[in-house]
């Protein structure tokens, strides 16, 4: 069994909690409230900054240009097309520039971002890739899950439903598959001596993913 499969098997309960969260389920069936999605989107926009920092440091720590290239391409997507997508989405959600530029990070957003940035500075390239395997792998998994269930939140014809459908469609194999496969290949080369640390990172990142969904769904002060 590969290292990645071992990690997913050992922490399957957490993995499934992240992929099958009620936030995702309601996103797929179109019943997720605008308030909950807006809170998620505002916090995710803040979180992306720390994810980009981690990816940038990963590029610098990569052992070769070949290993760095997929992460660099992922980083370019975050800083380019994805950032533009967020700006357009805020307009759709009725959130103006003053509002989204002045949103404060909620505690879970801050904690998750701090965890990733600290790991980026202190950890190895493989350790960073382990965290990214969670952050990107979970998103690919829930996107594939909703597609397999033929989720169609746009069926009611509402603007919000169409937006939800677009968000689901964005998280697909074409967009996330390359970086997830790259991180999987890096993690699968881990030696036994590295495993305790990788397991800890994988578990912590998953706990933060679940907490992020909880925060988006329930709110936080």
Each predicted region: which residue ranges?
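Hydrophobic alpha-helical segments
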Residues: 2-3, 7, 115-116, 214
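Active-site-proximal alpha-helical scaffolds that flank and shape metal-associated catalytic sites
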Residues: 68-175, 207
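Alpha-helical bundle segments that constitute or directly flank the non-heme di-iron/ferroxidase center
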Residues: 12-17, 31-61, 81, 130-140, ...
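Short alpha-helical hairpin
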Residues: 8-32, 51, 181-189
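Amphipathic, well-ordered alpha-helical segments in soluble domains
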Residues: 19, 47-54, 81-85, 108-112, ...
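A structure-centric feature marking long, well-folded core domains of fungal metabolic enzymes
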Residues: 3-14, 65-67, 96, 164-167, ...
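Long amphipathic all-alpha helical oligomerization modules
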Residues: 173-202
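Acidic, carboxylate-rich catalytic segments that either coordinate divalent cations
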Residues: 199-221
């Amino acid at each position: 069994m590969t290292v990645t499969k071992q990690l997913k098997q050992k922490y399957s309960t957490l993995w499934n909690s992240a992929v099958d969260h009620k936030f995702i389920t309601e996103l797929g069936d179109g019943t997720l409230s605008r308030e909950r999605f807006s809170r998620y989107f505002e916090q995710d926009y803040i979180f992306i900054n720390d994810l980009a920092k981690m990816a940038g440091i990963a590029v610098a720590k990569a052992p070769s240009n070949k290993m760095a290239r997929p992460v660099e391409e992922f980083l370019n997507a975050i800083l380019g097309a994805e950032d533009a997508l967020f700006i357009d989405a805020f307009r759709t959600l009725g959130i103006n520039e003053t509002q989204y530029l002045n949103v404060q990070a909620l505690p879970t957003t801050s904690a998750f971002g701090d965890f990733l940035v600290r790991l980026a500075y202190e950890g190895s390239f493989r350790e960073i890739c382990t965290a990214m395997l969670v952050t990107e792998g979970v998103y690919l998994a829930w996107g594939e899950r909703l597609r397999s269930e033929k989720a169609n939140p746009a069926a009611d014809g509402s603007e919000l439903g169409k937006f939800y459908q677009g968000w689901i469609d964005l998280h697909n194999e074409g967009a996330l598959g390359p970086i997830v496969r790259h991180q999987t290949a890096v993690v699968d080369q881990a030696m036994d001596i590295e495993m305790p640390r990788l397991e800890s990172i994988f578990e912590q990142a998953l706990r933060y993913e679940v907490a992020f969904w909880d925060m988006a769904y329930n709110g936080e002060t």
